[in-house]
């Protein structure tokens, strides 16, 4: 995308959020080089941990949740899958009966995931490239967490 297209996207994403308050933009950024080496040995574990920190409280509010991620990571080396991890966290940590439906789909087949990828790119540019133009347009409508470990 050109810089102007990114600005147009950010402006439209902000307008979408302001006219649809039920939509939530949530993000988590981690400084991976500060993560201990033994944790980085299986990056899926860190990914699973980040997903739970970002989404578990939101998921716990509902009786049933359909989680539709890109199938980037499903199992950690231990064999435990992200949906199993999230489901047990909901039941045991949050003590809720939320039913988690897990439907991974490739982002090239989902406009919603493409939208999320573009939103993520705006946030990534802020933290990694020090290009904050799009992030500054969106920051008031994004709930974001930064972990430095």
Predicted regions and their residues:
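Phosphate-ester processing/binding pockets and catalytic centers
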Residues: 1-149
């Amino acid at each position: 995308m050109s810089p102007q297209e990114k600005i147009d996207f950010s402006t439209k994403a902000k307008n979408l959020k302001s006219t649809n308050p039920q939509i939530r933009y949530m993000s988590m950024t981690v400084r991976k080089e500060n993560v201990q080496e033994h944790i980085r040995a299986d990056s899926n574990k860190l990914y699973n941990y980040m997903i739970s920190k970002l989404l578990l409280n939101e998921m716990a509010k509902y009786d049933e949740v359909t989680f539709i991620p890109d199938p980037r990571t499903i199992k950690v080396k231990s064999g435990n899958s992200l949906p199993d991890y999230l489901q047990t966290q909901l039941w045991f940590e949050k003590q809720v009966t939320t039913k988690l439906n897990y439907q991974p789909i490739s982002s090239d087949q989902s406009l919603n995931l493409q939208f999320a990828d573009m939103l993520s790119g705006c946030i990534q540019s802020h933290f990694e490239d020090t290009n904050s133009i799009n992030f500054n347009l969106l920051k008031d409508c994004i709930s974001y967490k930064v972990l430095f470990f």
